[in-house]
Regions:
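Alpha-helical scaffold segments that flank or form the walls of functional sites
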Residues: 2-61, 85-99
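A structural motif
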Residues: 39, 61, 131, 192-193
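His/Asp/Glu-enriched, well-ordered alpha-helical/loop segment
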Residues: 164-171, 211-295
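Metal-coordinating catalytic core of metallo-dependent amide/deamination hydrolases
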Residues: 51-178, 183
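Short, acidic/turn-prone active-site loops that include or flank metal/cofactor-
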Residues: 67-72, 140, 199-204, 227-229
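A conserved active-site cap/scaffold subdomain adjacent to cofactor or substrate pockets
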Residues: 180-183, 189-221
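Active-site glycine- and acidic-residue-rich loops that bind
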Residues: 43-46, 106-122, 203-206, 270-272
Length: 298
């Protein structure tokens, strides 16, 4: 997939049309959809974060708010420059970050290909200052990786460049990772960073699939996401189990427990919430939804 196509079809025009009212409605509908399909905690990477927080808080869902920051494009609906975006994220952390209650706030740069390195560095410093997660889309599109490798050829390629800059750490949560090769997966395993697998979108939007069996073999913590609020974790678990049985790679097949673990403890660990949620045991939050399996569409 080409970045220009992605920008025009899923980010620039659609995001630019959003109003506070429509974003509130989308956020609320997404939360209801998540609850309907058994999900009690959602991470929301979003523009207009104050509006998104209001909807998430009203819905009653446990949430991780991740105000979106980028520097290579500006939106009519959220026209912040990169310095203002950092200040907005800081404000959200100071006003909304309260994991013991229900809401966490993560520091979110949209992707490495649409953020200046000043913004990347400032975002990581902010995450370290407030001891919260640093999250980003990562190695999702072939076209983006090829362009980045060309840009940082003298530094050993893009992955080597970003590793040297210290952007991948134990507080990093990397969305997708679907273009990561074996040596890069091994390097990430040594940092303690987590990867969030999104099998639906990898297949439909990117035409690829993260090498999850190799990630797990190397000890990377893998969480599971649906990427879009209109999708659901149940379908993502099913797809995660199926797709890795048929990918033509040396490491194939996942244990049947792996998708469930990724959707629960894997995701909780990724966001530093595994002492509070992710499993049913004494002392943890009782985030429980019951589902009638006779009626469930999954």
């Amino acid at each position: 997939s080409h970045i220009s196509d992605h920008m025009l079809t899923t980010i620039h025009d659609p995001y630019g049309w959003l109003t506070q009212e429509s974003l509130y409605d989308i956020t609320m509908t997404s939360a209801i959809n998540a609850l309907k399909h058994g999900t009690t905690t959602v991470e929301n990477s979003t523009i207009l974060p104050d509006t998104a927080y209001e909807a998430m808080d009203t819905s009653g869902i446990r949430g991780i708010l991740a105000p979106q920051m980028a520097s290579s494009f500006r939106l009519d609906s959220d026209p912040l420059n990169w310095k203002q975006a950092l200040e907005k994220t800081k404000s959200c952390i100071e006003h909304y970050h309260n994991p013991k209650r229900r809401m966490s706030v993560a520091v979110h740069i949209h992707d490495l290909w649409d953020c200046m390195e000043k913004l990347m560095d400032g975002a990581l410093e902010l995450a370290e200052q407030y001891d919260t997660r640093f999250v980003t889309h990562f190695w999702e599109f072939q076209n983006a990786v090829e362009r980045a490798d060309e840009m940082w050829r003298d530094d050993g390629g893009a992955f080597s460049h970003y590793m040297k800059r210290g952007l991948i750490t134990s507080r990093s949560v990397l969305f997708h990772g679907s273009m990561l090769r074996e040596p890069e997966i091994e390097a990430i395993a040594g940092t303690g960073a987590s990867i969030i697998h999104n099998p639906d979108i990898n297949g439909t939007n990117c035409g690829n699939c993260a090498y999850v069996p190799y990630m797990l073999k190397n000890g990377i913590n893998v969480g599971l996401g649906s990427d879009y609020g209109s999708l659901d974790a149940m379908s993502a678990m099913k797809l995660m189990l199926i797709v890795h049985n048929i990918m033509p790679r040396a490491e194939r097949v996942l244990p049947y427990q792996a998708p469930f673990y990724a959707a629960t403890m894997g995701s909780a660990r990724a966001y530093g919430l595994d002492q509070e949620i992710g499993s049913i045991e004494p002392g943890k939050k009782a985030d429980i939804i019951t589902i009638d399996l006779k009626k469930a569409p999954h």
